[in-house]
């Protein structure tokens, strides 16, 4: 009997130590996408760059005046984890790995389109960022995760990991987490290896190397990411469990005015604003500032924070997101605060006023101009994403579509000097409140907002 009881105890202990096959599964097997000898399973498409196998490596070689070239899998993949090693010869070009991508010979003039994980050996150092080839362009520039810019090593093989599960894409370079994108397009597509177009003889003949290419497609489990990685979330008015777990909150729920009020009282404006189809929109009053519904502000106050928001301008429109708004000034027009300018730079006259462009899109209004490139600005009528980070030490940054466009030290001597020569010099201690409301401005033009999210920093 003692022996039987001992055996029973051992059985029970072993049973509970075993993985529960009904609730947890090991990841499925890895499948090689490259046999080390041939290009079987791959097709060449778009461009004229050369692809061949050398010493167990796929080698792509640039060709002058060719468009972007791709070696793509014959198979289409939905959810997967992809790993490979890559090396690039030239620092004047770039490359990338297409994921869930497509080829449309008619509508896209024979071009590949879809998400691309960047290989960028330039001084910009955006390797591991996510680019939408031949469509929306940059989804995840590495200004959003500057610490990862040093992950890619020039002149040597770099291990790249890409995880596509559900509508999420995560990337790693040499085991360093880089990008996190939640998207609304392309749940499946091919995998591709890019050789970028070149236009000079000096750039021609440069090589890109790919090896150890393998994929996992079954029993997948999302990998953990550190708490401080910013998520580009293209699902309107939605937070992922990751974002919620790390302190993000929606300031606009997509349905109601909960959390917002008029600067003129404790209720939301009865006119001048509308909430419909997941948007909060300030309506036109023919450019008359605060003459219709007036500005709206959050009910809560914020001190150090990271706030991002999508905005869509109509032609010639002007608005803004202000921060550290106290409402103490009791102004008749728009309330006073530091302002992330939201503006149609081409059609609104304010873009030509102020000093050195400090009233243009994404600028710190009337104080610091945004240093931005046209190609990172989405057209009027399309969505752009603004972002403001105020750190606990009063360092402040503005971003436009994931690219940092300015930074400053709130309360510094330089800041005080800028205020002294601005329209705000009549307000004592302008911009220096310990905490304040977040404000959406009524400047008399129709502008829509969505996906307004905030994380308090400590």
Region roles according to the model:
Residues 21-458:
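Carbohydrate-interacting regions of secretory-pathway proteins
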Residues 1-26:
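Bacterial Sec-dependent N-terminal signal peptides
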């Amino acid at each position: 009997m003692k022996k039987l009881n001992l055996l029973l105890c051992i059985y029970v202990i072993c049973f509970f130590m075993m993985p529960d096959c009904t609730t947890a599964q090991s990841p499925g097997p890895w499948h090689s996408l490259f046999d080390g000898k041939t290009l079987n399973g791959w097709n060449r498409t778009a461009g004229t760059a050369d692809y061949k196998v050398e010493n167990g490596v796929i080698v792509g070689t640039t060709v002058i005046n060719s468009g972007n070239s791709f070696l793509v899998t014959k198979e289409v993949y939905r959810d997967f984890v992809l790993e490979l090693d890559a090396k690039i010869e030239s620092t004047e070009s770039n490359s990338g790995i297409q994921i869930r991508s497509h080829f449309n010979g008619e509508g896209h003039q024979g071009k590949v389109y879809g998400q691309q994980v960047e290989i960028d050996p330039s001084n910009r150092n955006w390797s591991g960022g996510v680019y939408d080839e031949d469509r929306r362009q940059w989804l995840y520039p590495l200004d959003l995760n500057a610490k990862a810019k040093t992950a890619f090593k020039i002149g040597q093989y770099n291990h790249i990991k890409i995880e596509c599960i559900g509508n999420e894409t995560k990337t790693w370079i040499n085991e360093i987490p880089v990008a996190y994108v939640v998207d609304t397009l392309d749940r499946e597509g091919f995998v591709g290896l890019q050789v970028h177009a070149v236009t000079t003889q000096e750039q021609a003949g440069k090589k890109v190397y790919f090896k150890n290419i393998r994929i996992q497609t079954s029993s997948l489990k999302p990998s953990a990411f550190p708490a401080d990685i910013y998520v580009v979330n293209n699902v309107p008015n939605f937070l992922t469990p990751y974002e919620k777990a790390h302190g993000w909150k929606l300031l606009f729920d997509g349905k109601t005015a909960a959390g917002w009020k008029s600067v003129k009282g404790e209720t939301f404006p009865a006119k001048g604003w509308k909430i419909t189809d997941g948007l909060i929109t300030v309506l036109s009053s023919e450019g008359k500032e605060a003459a219709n519904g007036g500005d709206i502000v959050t009910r809560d106050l914020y001190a150090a924070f990271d706030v991002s928001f999508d905005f869509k301008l109509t032609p010639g429109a002007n608005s803004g997101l202000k921060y550290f708004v106290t409402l103490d000034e009791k102004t008749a027009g728009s309330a006073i605060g530091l302002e992330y300018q939201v503006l149609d730079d081409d059609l609104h006259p304010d873009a030509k006023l102020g000093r050195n462009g400090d009233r243009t899109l994404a600028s710190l209004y009337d104080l610091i101009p945004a240093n931005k490139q046209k190609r990172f600005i989405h057209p009027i009528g399309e969505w752009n994403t603004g972002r403001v980070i105020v750190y606990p030490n009063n360092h402040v940054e503005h971003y436009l579509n994931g690219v940092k466009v300015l930074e400053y030290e709130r309360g510094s001597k330089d800041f005080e000097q800028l205020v002294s020569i601005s329209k705000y010099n009549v307000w004592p201690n302008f911009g220096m409140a310990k905490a304040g409301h977040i404000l959406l401005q009524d400047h008399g033009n129709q502008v829509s907002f969505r996906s307004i999210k905030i994380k308090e920093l400590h």
